Amino acid sequence: MNILDALDAQSKRTDLPDFRAGDTVKVHARVVEGNRSRVQIFQGVVIRRQGDGLRETFLVRKISFGVGVERTYPVNSPAIDRIEVVTRGDVRRAKLYYLRELRGKKAKIKEKREKQPS
């Protein structure tokens, strides 16, 4: 095993849930302001997951006061306190850039229903 691969394996986070493009998530990010630290929650739809290993990132989009806001987070960042999956989205694409042009009900993502055991 390569030395860099060993370092990557040590730094990778295992406490995060499994999520993908189309899911609505709440990202609890730690923000440092001066000498104080607080947790800021950013809730939105995952537009993409990009990269692999330690350098993997994901893009979250939400509409705030009628303006689209997008934030990119590194998956393995220590600044992320935790990630909550609010709903699972049923989409057929890995990158949902087309949501940027859609407004209102057209921008709504179908919710994935889990099959109940019978």
Swiss-Prot record:
Keywords: Ribonucleoprotein, Ribosomal protein. GO terms for biological process: translation. Pfam families: Ribosomal_L19. GO terms for cellular component: cytosolic large ribosomal subunit. The keyword Membrane does not apply. GO terms for molecular function: structural constituent of ribosome. The keyword Ribosomal protein applies. InterPro entries: Ribosomal_bL19, Ribosomal_bL19_CS, Ribosomal_bL19_sf, Translation_prot_SH3-like_sf. This protein is located at the 30S-50S ribosomal subunit interface and may play a role in the structure and function of the aminoacyl-tRNA binding site. Belongs to the bacterial ribosomal protein bL19 family. This is Large ribosomal subunit protein bL19. The lineage of its organism: Bacteria, Bacillati, Actinomycetota, Actinomycetes, Micromonosporales. The gene is rplS.
